[in-house]
Design a protein with these regions (language model features):
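Flexible "arm" and connector segments at domain edges
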Residues: 1-66, 70-107
Length: 107
């Protein structure tokens, strides 16, 4: 179910997040998250995960809630310094054939 441009979407969004975190433009939701701190961002990730669980159970709004969760996770990754590249590296490490066969937490 992969398609051309999927990575581009995540990279484009992550680039926008990095820009907003650096410039902190007035009215930016991303900038307001950063100003409230890591604790707030971490709570938002938990809140969005819970909303995605409910959506999955009801079958309503799954894509929208998944998008909200991914956005907040990307903000958290940017703020912690792990970044999108760190996430990609960890996912690659977990894939079968990654040298040690992965750690059983991936595909």
């Amino acid at each position: 179910m992969s398609g051309a441009g999927e990575g581009d979407t995540f990279e484009k969004l992550y680039g926008i997040i990095l820009d907003r975190l650096e410039r902190r433009p007035e009215g930016s939701y991303t900038a307001s998250l950063a100003e409230r701190g890591m604790g707030h961002v971490a709570r938002k990730v938990g809140e969005e995960a819970a909303e995605l669980m409910v959506a999955a159970l009801t079958g309503e709004g799954v894509a929208a809630e998944a998008a909200d969760l991914i956005y907040h996770v990307l903000v958290l990754l940017a703020m912690t310094g792990v970044g999108l590249e760190g996430l990609k590296a960890e996912l690659e490490r977990r894939m079968p054939g990654a040298g040690d066969g992965g750690d059983g937490k991936g595909p």
